[in-house]
UniProtKB/Swiss-Prot annotation:
Disulfide cysteine pairs (residue numbers): none
Residue segments, region Disordered: 1-22
Keywords (A to Z) from UniProt: Magnesium, Manganese, Menaquinone biosynthesis, Metal-binding, Thiamine pyrophosphate, Transferase
CDD domains: TPP_PYR_MenD, TPP_SHCHC_synthase
Gene transcribed to yield this protein: menD
Cofactors, names only: Mg(2+); Mn(2+); thiamine diphosphate
Subunit record text: Homodimer.
EC class name: transferase
Catalytic activity of the protein: isochorismate + 2-oxoglutarate + H(+) = 5-enolpyruvoyl-6-hydroxy-2-succinyl-cyclohex-3-ene-1-carboxylate + CO2
Protein function: Catalyzes the thiamine diphosphate-dependent decarboxylation of 2-oxoglutarate and the subsequent addition of the resulting succinic semialdehyde-thiamine pyrophosphate anion to isochorismate to yield 2-succinyl-5-enolpyruvyl-6-hydroxy-3-cyclohexene-1-carboxylate (SEPHCHC).
UniProt protein name: 2-succinyl-5-enolpyruvyl-6-hydroxy-3-cyclohexene-1-carboxylate synthase
Cofactor note: Binds 1 thiamine pyrophosphate per subunit.
Length: 588
């Protein structure tokens, strides 16, 4: 058994006792989590975990937590992932035993590789019922591999020592998940009888909330990196700053401080600022740009280009990777020369004019590429001093633009234009995130994506978690909307997440589906040049003809079809009481 520390337990003096070991364990653990500041719990129904479920229901009744119930554990795992991504705190996810636990694995893998805090509370049989082919029983501790922290808690006894231990384990597991930004698995054994009625928890919750508020007020500010962890960066080498997924704003701050060009992916958190180079892919391959880079400083996890790992792996380039965004360090070709926790710029450039030219050349070239691409899809502009005939021609051209079919580039631009800083944007793994990365200008908008393993699974549920977390607070994001942009296969892979049960919280959310009938991302990969078209269609493109309008109706979502520029603009600004699925037909 792996435990997470030996801090003294702080059981509540008013924590109720029922005399049932299973229920009292659930009370001790969940009230300890409320004292830690837990606000959201995700739960799937099941017999072995019923004590935890019933206590969670009582906590919801007395406003102790926001409870989110799902019938599919895979969807529940990604919902918890989304809550953790947005809030920075683990949202405990409760399941019963057996395959229920296994279905959390995709979300756990994404959480580990992305550095997202997660806390799994999984019900299990006691030791005497394991390994004897008991129903719905398998080896749950270690199911997620040796990289995920696991605590295997034996079946409870009715003693103060056991309850103190349970509270301590729950608290320590939560803190480790939160502070280390990693999944932690607490496997909890329960012995019959599995539950009794849960007492009123209003008083216990009031005390727990007061304790959480007091601890939050007394908590010291997060400690920054020590001087030994900070690498000084002198001016001199021609430098490019790269911001991969989840880099945060530190990459933009460094690029500005150093006066260096910034290649920031769309989900980096640094896709803004005066030094932003949107078209860095094209420029890395262009003579006079990529071939002149002498030093590259990487934040986050770059996943959307092949040019960046090639640059980092070059023998003539000094490669520095700052910090970590998940369980593994970014080090393509094992060429990274330094991996500091933080960096800072020191000194002044020897030739300030040359330093400005270096960055200005990148920024101006990128803008020229974007302007050229934008001109092809932009609506006409009415010049001043026009004649009546010219105005009629303009009106006809403008009407034609409104009626024009939506392309991938127009789709991502329209979505970007409709999204404000208090909104949230979630991009699924498809051609569309790459189109957004290539086409969208700088803007300080919070963009999320599951790029730890870059799978298509769980995108809708992740988006729902992000929406629920962002809209639950009192800040500006509470008034925002979450938009989730996916391809058709990404939607269908996670279609069960459209099920939001009766009585569940329904956030403001739009799921925008670029429907091109299958997996067109493979059309741009090497396989398109090596395999027969019929084989590609059969095993890679995987064509589909799902009626998305009927699908949306079955799950209680509003469906809109937006095939033209005008229809898309209207759909994105539609106010809907129900969650909204916007289908955008696209040509393969």
């Amino acid at each position: 058994m792996t435990t997470t520390g030996s801090l003294p337990a702080q059981p509540s003096s008013t924590s109720p006792r029922t005399g049932n070991p299973s229920t009292d364990r659930a009370l001790a653990m969940l009230l300890a989590l409320v004292r830690e500041g837990v606000t959201d719990v995700v739960l799937c129904p099941g017999s072995r975990s019923q004590a935890l479920a019933l206590v969670a229901a009582e906590l919801e009744r007395v406003d102790g937590v926001r409870l989110h119930v799902r019938i599919d554990e895979r969807a529940a795992g990604f919902l918890a992932l989304g809550l953790g991504v947005e809030s920075g705190r683990p949202a405990p996810v409760i399941t019963t035993s057996g395959t229920a636990v296994a279905n959390l694995h995709p979300a756990v893998l994404e959480g580990w590789h992305s550095g997202v805090p997660m806390l799994l509370l999984t019900g299990d049989r006691p030791a005497e019922l394991r390994g004897i082919a008991s129903n719905q029983t398998t080896r749950q501790p270690g199911m997620f591999g040796d990289r995920v922290v696991v605590v295997d808690v034996p079946a409870p006894e009715e003693t103060d020592e056991d309850l103190s231990r349970d509270a301590r384990l729950a608290r320590d597991a939560y803190r480790r998940a939160r502070d280390e930004r990693t999944p932690v698995h607490v496997n909890v054994a329960f012995r019959d009888p599995l539950s009794v009625a849960v007492p009123d928890l209003a008083e216990a919750v009031a005390e727990a909330h007061a304790a959480a508020d007091a601890e939050a007020a007394a908590a010291p500010a997060p400690a920054g990196p020590t001087a030994a962890d900070v690498l000084d960066l002198p001016h001199g080498p021609r430098t490019l700053v790269v911001a991969g997924h989840a880099a945060g704003e530190a990459a933009e701050e460094l690029a500005r401080a150093g006066g260096w060009p910034l290649a920031a992916e769309i989900s980096s958190g640094s896709h803004f600022g005066p030094n932003l180079v949107v078209s860095f892919r094209e420029l890395l391959a262009r003579p006079g740009f990529g071939d002149r880079v002498e030093r590259v400083i990487v934040f986050g996890h770059p996943t959307l280009t092949r040019e960046v790992p090639l640059l980092v792996g070059r023998e003539d380039v000094e490669a520095i990777v700052v910090g970590s965004t998940g369980g593994e360090d970014y080090d393509p070709r094992h060429r990274v020369t330094a991996h500091p926790a933080a960096v800072r710029v020191v000194g002044e450039p020897a030739d300030p004019a040359e330093a400005r030219r270096w960055t200005g050349t990148w920024v101006q070239a990128s803008r020229a590429i974007l302007d050229e691409a934008s001109a092809a899809e932009s609506a006409p502009l009415l010049p001043s001093g026009t004649t009546p005939a010219e105005r009629r021609d303009f009106a006809r051209a403008e009407l034609a633009a409104v009626r024009a079919d939506v392309t991938r580039r127009h789709l991502v631009r329209a979505l970007w234009q409709a999204t404000w800083p208090h909104d949230r944007l979630v991009l699924g793994a498809s051609r569309l995130i790459r189109e957004a990365d290539r086409a969208l200008p700088g803007k300080r908008v919070r963009v999320h994506a599951n790029r730890g393993l870059a799978g298509i699974d769980g995108t809708i549920s992740t988006g729902l978690g992000i929406a629920l977390a962002s809209q639950a607070g009192s800040g500006s994001a509470a008034a925002g909307i979450t938009r989730v942009l996916v391809g058709d296969l990404t939607l269908l892979h996670d279609v069960g997440s459209l099920l939001i049960g009766t009585g569940e919280r329904v956030p403001r959310i739009q799921v925008i589906v670029g429907n091109d009938g299958g997996g067109t991302i493979f059309d741009g990969l090497e396989v398109a040049n090596t395999a027969a078209p019929a084989a590609i269609d059969r095993v890679m493109f995987t064509p589909q003809r799902v009626d998305l309008a009927s699908l949306a109706k079955a799950y209680g979502w509003t469906h809109l079809r937006a095939a033209t520029h005008g229809e898309l603009e209207a759909a994105l600004t539609t106010a809907s009481g129900a969650p909204l699925l916007i289908e955008v037909p696209l040509v393969r």
